[in-house]
Amino acid sequence: MIRNLILTILTLCAAMCLCAAGLAAAEAAGGQSATRLLYQGHASIRIVTGEGKVVYIDPYAGEGYELPADLILVTHGHSDHNKVGLVKQRAGGCRVITHAEALAGGEHKSFDLGYVSVRAVEAGNNPNHDVSKCVGYVLTFSDGTSVYFSGDTSTTKQMPELAALKLDYAFFCCDGVFNMGAEEASQCAALVKAKQSVPYHTAAPRDTDFSMERAEEFKADNRLIIEKGQEMTLKHSR
């Protein structure tokens, strides 16, 4: 009986070791959760990283603000992009980066937060948006996934340089009222050369948070249309 008990204990120990090894292997193989993006409408984006960090960009439209933020990014000071008060900030600390900090001293800044690196890039360049008061952002997550958000803009001199980053996704405003329209945005997508090009900010804020008609006018190669309220997994293409 004692011998059988010892054999049973040894069998259980071996099973536990195999289980632990399997879990360790899964983690080593990339057990981290996928990065998820929620398009809230207009230019508002929520991203939950593989580490569980929550990033909001240009809070204003839609729903989905219940998750406490670790990072809030604002591209410029217009009221349809900077409703930071909509977002509950994480009690342990939340970083808020606005265009003012990202363009301090007239230089586009970069910020390394560990789970994501943020690079401010040129935006504006039209009568409604001064390049000295607007930025776009390139976000690169810890798994290598990279995403460009144009902010409110027309074509900028820096856009061709972004092609060298081999971006996974690029979001282009295309309302055609206060910024470039779908045709110009399509031309910008050809300059940036992201693997997936996404139309957003498809209408003036007084009209609607999302226009499928305008989104479909965006004719970029590898176009990806994300509707308001739609969530997707961000994937890094090597």
Residue ranges and their predicted role:
Residues 84-108, 193-203, 222-223:
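P-loop/Walker A phosphate-binding loop and immediately adjacent motor/lid segment at beta-alpha junctions
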Residues 26-67, 71, 101-165, 180, ...:
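Core dinuclear metal-dependent hydrolase active-site scaffold
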Residues 8-20:
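Bacterial N-terminal signal peptides
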Residues 155-234:
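Cap/insert and terminal regions of metallo-dependent hydrolase folds
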Residues 1-5:
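Positively charged n-region of N-terminal signal peptides that target proteins for export
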Residues 71-73, 97, 119, 171, ...:
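Hydrophobic/aromatic beta-strand patches that form the interior of the parallel beta-sheet core
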Residues 61-101:
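Di-metal (Zn2+ and/or Mg2+/Mn2+) metal-binding site signature of metallo-dependent hydrolases
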